[in-house]
């Protein structure tokens, strides 16, 4: 392959994101300079933060039309002009949505090949680290605590619930729709669920957490956060994510 296929941001969305906001382009294959590594992108992480980057500067510079869509990936080293990296090495890198990228070695994080490669972007990646440290360091759950998590069927929320179960907690997941709620209980072992789309949020929450809430992991804010705050026990902890 002599060209680099890219998915670029064609225009900045003002409302709902759609295919019309992206464009497929081809660019010359990047050539790594001294201290850089040429990468072949294997898997790209699609995250909720991607949408926020289109709205303006956050913890990273704002995206502009015509740029390669930003995003992290698991990539394989193709060629290296940097010590410590060799062809075949697996890395996490902020490559963007493209087939290849040449990046400074200092921006790469080596990865160990273990299990499905997709786990390096999820369980061992940003979602997993967010869930693990957000729950255990901020939420500080104890065995027997009631832990409630919103957006429970999402990448972070689903991991929060599973970690809380390992800690011996009663876990309540808040999600939208019967299918998501059923998945949380049958596949992930949540003790109770709240379907915010079904109405009567406060009543559902009271039934799911009759002893109150000791830890609330908030992924959404708004009305759901407010409802959970009114159910918090004395000394309860709230971890705000996002």
Segments the model singles out, each with a brief description of its role:
Residues 6, 41, 131, 164, ...:
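Terminal peptide-recognition signature
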Residues 28-46, 54-97:
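Glycine-rich beta-strand-centered segment in the early N-terminal region that forms part
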Residues 69-76, 87-151:
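NAD(P)H dinucleotide-binding glycine-rich loop of Rossmann-like/cofactor-binding domains
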Residues 79-81, 95, 151, 175, ...:
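Conserved "cap/hinge" positions at secondary-structure junctions
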Residues 90, 146, 170, 236-238:
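Short glycine-centered segments of the SAM/dcSAM-binding site in methyltransferase folds
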Residues 125-198:
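Mid-domain Rossmann-like dinucleotide-binding core that forms the NAD(H)/NADP(H) cofactor-binding site
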Residues 187-188, 192-242:
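Glycine-rich cofactor phosphate-binding loops and adjacent beta1-alpha1 units
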């Amino acid at each position: 392959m002599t060209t680099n296929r890219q998915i670029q941001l064609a225009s900045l969305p003002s409302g709902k994101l759609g295919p019309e906001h992206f464009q497929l382009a081809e660019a010359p294959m990047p050539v790594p300079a001294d201290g850089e590594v040429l990468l072949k992108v294997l898997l790209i992480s699609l995250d909720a933060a991607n949408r926020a980057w289109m709205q303006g500067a956050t913890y990273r510079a704002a995206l502009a039309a015509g740029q390669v869509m930003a995003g992290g990936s698991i990539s394989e080293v193709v060629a290296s002009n940097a010590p410590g990296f060799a062809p075949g090495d697996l890395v996490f890198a902020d490559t963007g949505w493209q087939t290849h990228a040449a990046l400074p070695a200092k921006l790469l994080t080596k990865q160990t090949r273990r299990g499905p490669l997709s786990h390096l972007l999820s369980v061992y990646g940003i979602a997993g680290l967010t869930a693990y440290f957000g729950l255990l360091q901020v939420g500080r759950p104890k065995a027997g605590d009631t832990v409630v998590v919103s957006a429970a069927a999402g990448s972070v929320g689903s991991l929060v619930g599973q970690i809380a179960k390992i800690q011996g907690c009663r876990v309540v997941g808040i999600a939208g729709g019967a299918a998501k709620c059923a998945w949380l209980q049958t596949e992930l072992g949540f003790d109770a669920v709240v379907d915010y789309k079904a109405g009567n949020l406060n009543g559902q929450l009271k039934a799911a957490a009759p002893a109150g809430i000791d830890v609330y992991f908030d992924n959404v804010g708004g009305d759901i956060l407010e409802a959970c705050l009114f159910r918090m026990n004395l000394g309860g902890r709230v971890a705000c994510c996002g």
